[in-house]
Amino acid sequence: MSRRKQSNPRQIKRSLGDMEAREEVQLVGASHMEQKATAPEAPSPPSADVNSPPPLPPPTSPGGPKELEGQEPEPRPTEEEPGSPWSGPDELEPVVQDGQRRIRARLSLATGLSWGPFHGSVQTRASSPRQAEPSPALTLLLVDEACWLRTLPQALTEAEANTEIHRKDDALWCRVTKPVPAGGLLSVLLTAEPHSTPGHPVKKEPAEPTCPAPAHDLQLLPQQAGMASILATAVINKDVFPCKDCGIWYRSERNLQAHLLYYCASRQGTGSPAAAATDEKPKETYPNERVCPFPQCRKSCPSASSLEIHMRSHSGERPFVCLICLSAFTTKANCERHLKVHTDTLSGVCHSCGFISTTRDILYSHLVTNHMVCQPGSKGEIYSPGAGHPATKLPPDSLGSFQQQHTALQGPLASADLGLAPTPSPGLDRKALAEATNGEARAEPLAQNGGSSEPPAAPRSIKVEAVEEPEAAPILGPGEPGPQAPSRTPSPRSPAPARVKAELSSPTPGSSPVPGELGLAGALFLPQYVFGPDAAPPASEILAKMSELVHSRLQQGAGAGAGGAQTGLFPGAPKGATCFECEITFSNVNNYYVHKRLYCSGRRAPEDAPAARRPKAPPGPARAPPGQPAEPDAPRSSPGPGAREEGAGGAATPEDGAGGRGSEGSQSPGSSVDDAEDDPSRTLCEACNIRFSRHETYTVHKRYYCASRHDPPPRRPAAPPGPPGPAAPPAPSPAAPVRTRRRRKLYELHAAGAPPPPPPGHAPAPESPRPGSGSGSGPGLAPARSPGPAADGPIDLSKKPRRPLPGAPAPALADYHECTACRVSFHSLEAYLAHKKYSCPAAPPPGALGLPAAACPYCPPNGPVRGDLLEHFRLAHGLLLGAPLAGPGVEARTPADRGPSPAPAPAASPQPGSRGPRDGLGPEPQEPPPGPPPSPAAAPEAVPPPPAPPSYSDKGVQTPSKGTPAPLPNGNHRYCRLCNIKFSSLSTFIAHKKYYCSSHAAEHVK
């Protein structure tokens, strides 16, 4: 019994016959209503409007008037009897009102809710002129006779209807156009096309399948339909899941579901995605507008170039390739941003080829020019073909060009490794290289996941080798990783698979590569995903060579045969990189970069090499000049220059940490780089006369750019410092330091074992207020070089506090093998020393060591010169002095003016007197002191003559005419003989000689 009958108990009193008669009348009325709805010329009853009164009273039984006297004037709709099945949606229910079947909403219906699809059509008919009242011009034709849409009354106007039936995609849809409250009756309006309404989800009928809409549901433009047909035939991989609304393809169904749930643009659309697309308002068109041809994307781009960039998001094309790690990018800006990863911004070094730049802009320009290529058609790793998708194959010409470049870059071994004959043509195509490495090698991880009838091209990896290693054959042992061959039958068209070579060991781990292989060391760096899990990537050796090139330039002489020592393989080299200086292997290259920048023992001066490398260096007698006895204390004189780090590294040994360095307690500027960096408030570099705003910048300058960065810390005996005084007798130093590269670059070089200079010439200036003068006025003040066992090899800094016995100094040029005066390089120490002693025109005469040191204003920073100063001017700077300023006169005046008396002296004498202790390990060595810089008032006391500059400052270089003989009459003082450049200004010439002269070229290569 319905709720209507329960609310009116008087209806229960009716007899069973009356109830059956009423039901028959209702059924007849419902069938009559259906006939009127389906008849072409039958007008819609006026009761279609919910608010209009019913035209006919409901038929009743003969006893009806008596029983219905107390009812309301307007009867309420009656729910259909339970015997009638309801096949419509759950939100609606059928009711009978005024003898007509109506549809009532059970719940509140929001605008845009749709039901469908239904099989049928909407036909248009012409209204008859004899009709007295208006009738709808459309007729609803349904295939299903029992469809609930037939019971919906049709409204004459859109204002009267709250739902509409429209045709879309060969089917009928019923959509709510106005909000319908719960219990409201529905009235429908037939339309040919759907109206624009906000998008809402579509409710499918239960009888319809829940599979995605077929492809013909999409309404495409002609060019979009053409593109869709091409894609339908091109995509043969069944594992690709496309989003029809966004045009994005996914290789995982879970990714597609997540996209549809959270990111899809049509997730709030109504009807099908095509309906939501057609409901959008048309956008303004521009003259040069380009529309994306991909289905359902329809993104408008203002220009053809922007459309090309946008199309890469659909095709996966990444034309900009980083040649260092073979990463591909869609835009040039992204690739340039990525290139910054491969640089060391502190030292301005390119991690790939070792290029050193003074400015960041030059370094970035180098990276973009040499290590980035634009290769159209390159595919990124994300969009590389899958297991069932055929990979792109290189045409024969591209393969040949790739082989040509590979042969030119890596030499004959690379060609033999690939199994292809090397081509002698030097013309290279870097785009072919990027296409081969990026498009082919990146397809390997996805291609190996499953089989396919058409195999892709075999993977290929690049190996960088030096040209000087022809004897190292690419042989793989049984325990070494094999070639990364795909697990499929190779096609005859596919190129031969490349073999991943095991890495060659470093020739001399503590030394730099030979000059011939500097251009190829680290030219390419393969990422980890190119190799299989068992392969040994070449990143370790490449990065090791780069670090050796940058930080160990001075250690070339550690092994004369460095080029021929690479005979072993590295079968168990793990992925990542290895720091050969610290004996640490990193699994991540980024960790290796951080280690090299912040923690590596080789980040300081090139003299700092780990002591662990000493046993691998050649023996000491091979490094020492002939005729000098070997030092019996082997641990104290390391055979290789790499051992000099033991003292500079801080506490390399327990003795060093306990006893400390000889100058640890003083503030002498001659201490090591670590002593200068210990003071966090220190920002002034006195060697270069540069003040920095931050201590970190100062530290970087001292490590990589300072003029004294190659100076080894001086050795001093562990003797108690004597009181400062002008008459302190200088004692011969048992271990004088090796003359640094910067000091002996263009100066007159002296031979080892010369007699010491006279003691009066080395008395320190009494007026010097330097804080370290007290500790430096002892026996360590004299720069004498006495022969002894210390002349065998370089200085062992870790043992310098324990050397009280006198001994001969080490060879003056033990760590240097290039004569900058003659521009000749030597690969052995013996040949270099013989050249400097007998053949070099810049070498001083045999008795030059007995002469006092004079200061050259043209050599930074006021460097002392032993021997004939005028001869040094002539050989090093191309200066010719006139007759009044003869060499003997200057030398005759020099010893007399170097006494402790502060009396006025000639112009050239104050500089030798003040620079002598600096050359002989006095209180004024190369390195700046940890304490504050000297005050301006103290400078005149050290150098009494007003024309002379201060002894510790580089400002004297700016006024060479006052500290040297008068300007020459011939004007040659503004001409640089080495660079063949004439200068119009003397200050410009001095700046050139100090910073830019070609004589500094060897020093800038770290």
Swiss-Prot record:
Residues 15-25, 66-79 have a biased composition (Basic and acidic residues). GO terms for cellular component: chromatin; nucleoplasm; nucleus; transcription regulator complex; transcription repressor complex. Zn(2+) 3 binds at residues 685, 688, 701, 706. The gene is ZFPM1. Zn(2+) 5 binds at residues 976, 979, 992, 997. Zn(2+) 4 binds at residues 819, 822, 835, 840. GO terms for molecular function: DNA binding; RNA polymerase II-specific DNA-binding transcription factor binding; transcription corepressor activity; zinc ion binding. Residues 1-13 have a biased composition (Basic residues). Zn(2+) 1 binds at residues 243, 246, 259, 264. InterPro entries: FOG, ZF_CCHC_FOG, ZFPM1/2_PR, Znf_C2H2_sf, Znf_C2H2_type. It is found in: Nucleus. Zn(2+) 2 binds at residues 579, 582, 595, 600. The modification Phosphoserine is found at residues 84, 128, 272, 384, 491, 494, 638, 671, 786, 901, 909, 914, 935. A zinc finger (CCHC FOG-type) spans 235-268, 571-604, 677-710, 811-844, 968-1001. Interacts with corepressor CTBP2; this interaction is however not essential for corepressor activity. Interacts with the N-terminal zinc-finger of GATA1, GATA2 and probably GATA3. This is Zinc finger protein ZFPM1. Residues 485-515, 780-791 have a biased composition (Low complexity). The CCHC FOG-type zinc fingers 1, 2, 3 and 5 directly bind to GATA-type zinc fingers. The Tyr residue adjacent to the last Cys of the CCHC FOG-type zinc finger is essential for the interaction with GATA-type zinc fingers. SUPFAM superfamilies: beta-beta-alpha zinc fingers (SSF57667). Belongs to the FOG (Friend of GATA) family. Gene3D superfamilies: Classic Zinc Finger. Residues 794-800 are annotated as: Interaction with CTBP2. GO terms for biological process: atrial septum morphogenesis; atrioventricular valve morphogenesis; cardiac muscle tissue morphogenesis; definitive erythrocyte differentiation; embryonic hemopoiesis; erythrocyte differentiation; granulocyte differentiation; heart development.
